[in-house]
Curated annotation (Swiss-Prot):
Keywords: Cytoplasm, NAD, Oxidoreductase. InterPro entries: Ald_DH/histidinol_DH (IPR016161), Ald_DH_C (IPR016163), Ald_DH_CS_GLU (IPR029510), Ald_DH_N (IPR016162), Aldehyde_DH_dom (IPR015590), Aldehyde_DH_NAD(P) (IPR012394). NAD(+) binds at residues 196-201. It is found in: Cytoplasm. Its EC number is 1.2.1.5. It catalyses: an aldehyde + NADP(+) + H2O = a carboxylate + NADPH + 2 H(+); an aldehyde + NAD(+) + H2O = a carboxylate + NADH + 2 H(+). The gene is comG. One of its GO terms (cellular component) is lipid droplet. It comes from Dictyostelium discoideum. This is Aldehyde dehydrogenase family 3 comG. The active site is at 218, 252.
């Protein structure tokens, strides 16, 4: 039996209880929101070492990677939200047209209600807590479904969140599998925030459509990286290897494949070899700076990709230890899973091009990426790529860092997702902007010409008030 509170009661009861608490208006109070945000901050501060150890056990990541993505980013999001919550939540007075006078117009920021958040295993703290922070800031109740694949950190988070947060307003699950998720989607939620694969994202979207439930879908896909001939090969190689090997390539914004100018392919590959040795030593498997794959099954899937092109670097695997070496593949089969499916591992296929138009056509004929990368010092090339492509984000001459900026919207387009978040964007997802017009009851200000019977005079006056479009 699941240890989670969300699994010990029928979902019908959980849904009803959360709805009842929301309707009590408890979560609307700004003091309650601050108290819950500060509780998460306290939880992170008091349990940093335990969180680090649990993530390390699941993914084999170095403490540096864990701290940057699972600790620091949460602290940044909390600080940003706590500092600005009052101003974000403030009612806005907006201009009222002449025919409204003396009425006043406002935009209210109101909670959505009871929301469902479904988080993945690859960044199990970050991708669970940042949406939850937004849901709390917006004044909502929430059910958070943690991934059972990152079992150690999900189990720890389940216990900590249950301890630190208001138990009436939240439910957490860390063990429910596909049947539980299927049942979750049979209930009406006021918003669903899902992070995961395109395949499951489509299932979530279809289920939400039954209730016209709004969704945020943070998906993945194949993120291309263009490497122009006008680039610093040494610096480019360092940033590419760093971006591809962070979390052993298990990153939704990770570069999935390279499109390299034919003239620099060989020197770039040689520089990759130098950088890999510098970063991880002679035996990468022994390096504490290189993470492990989440499961043996995932490692086996990645190993199968080795045969779908020519391996020029790497190609080693230890399935029992969930180890896949950083592997570079040239001449990949374009119709194979290597070039059709999201890789989600340290396997990097390379295709080549000779002119930028050919390169852009290759990208345009594929689903829109969550992130597109470009390495080039040529401003004309940068402009052409920016104007000639669509993607959730575009990063030029570096990798991954855009994800850490709370002032940038993070999200996809098309197959890579719906909606964006981080910073104020996370708050905006979880509130409804409700229009309010407050009119007068003073009879002497009630213009008679608005009422029937209408006359040419009333039509003429209305035209002058409302403008030429009347």
């Amino acid at each position: 039996m699941s240890t989670s509170a969300a699994a010990t009661l029928p979902l019908s009861v959980i849904s009803k209880n959360l709805r009842k608490v929301f309707l009590s208006q408890k979560t609307r109070k700004i003091d309650w929101r601050y108290s819950q945000l500060k509780a998460i901050k306290k939880m992170m501060s008091e349990n940093k070492d335990n969180i680090t150890a649990a993530v390390k056990k699941d993914l084999g990541k170095h403490e540096f990677e864990i701290h940057q993505t699972e600790i620091v980013m949460i602290q940044t999001e909390l600080d940003e939200t706590i500092s600005h919550l009052e101003s974000w939540n403030k009612t806005e007075k907006v201009y009222s047209p002449l025919h409204f006078k003396p009425a006043s117009s406002y935009i209210l920021k109101e909670p959505l209600g009871v929301v469902l958040i479904m988080s993945p295993w690859n960044y199990p703290v970050n991708l669970a807590l940042i949406p939850l922070i937004g849901a709390i800031a917006g004044g909502n109740c929430a059910l958070l479904k943690l991934s059972r694949h990152s079992y150690n950190i999900s189990k720890l988070l389940h216990g900590l969140l249950t301890k630190y947060l208001d138990p009436e307003c939240f439910e957490f699950d860390c063990e429910g599998g596909a049947p539980y998720i299927t049942e979750l989607l049979e209930y009406k939620w006021d918003h669903i925030f899902f992070t995961g694969s395109v395949k499951v994202g489509k299932i979530v979207y279809q289920a939400a459509a039954k209730f016209l439930t709004p969704v945020t879908l943070e998906l993945g896909g194949k993120n291309p990286c263009i490497v122009d001939k006008d680039t610093d090969i040494k610096l480019t190689a360092r940033r590419l290897i760093w971006g591809k090997c962070w979390n052993a390539g298990q990153t939704c914004i990770g570069l999935d494949y390279l499109i390299v100018h034919k003239s620099i392919l060989e020197p770039l590959i040689e520089e990759f070899k130098v950088v890999l040795k510098e970063f991880f030593g002679e035996d990468i498997k022994k390096s504490t700076s290189f993470a492990r794959i989440i499961s043996s099954a995932a490692a086996e899937r990645l190993q199968q990709l080795f045969s779908m092109g020519k391996v020029v670097i790497g190609g080693e695997a230890d399935i029992a230890e969930r180890y896949i070496a950083p592997t570079v593949i040239v001449d990949p089969d374009l119709d194979s899973p290597l070039m059709q499916d999201e890789i989600f591992g340290p396997v990097l296929p390379i295709v080549t091009y000779e002119n930028i138009d050919e390169c852009l056509e290759f990208i345009q004929n594929r689903p829109h990426a969550l992130t597109l990368y470009l390495f080039s010092r040529d401003q004309a090339i940068q402009d052409k790529v920016l104007d000639g492509t669509q993607s959730g984000s575009l990063m030029i001459n570096d990798t991954l860092l855009h994800f850490t900026n709370p002032n940038l919207p993070f999200g996809g387009i098309g197959d890579s997702g719906i909606g964006s978040y981080h910073g104020k964007g996370t708050f905006d997802i979880f509130v409804h902007k409700r229009g309010l017009v407050q009119s007068t009851t003073k009879k002497f200000l009630d213009l008679p010409l608005r009422y029937p019977p209408y006359t040419p005079f009333s039509d003429n006056v209305a035209g002058k008030i409302l403008g030429s479009g009347w």
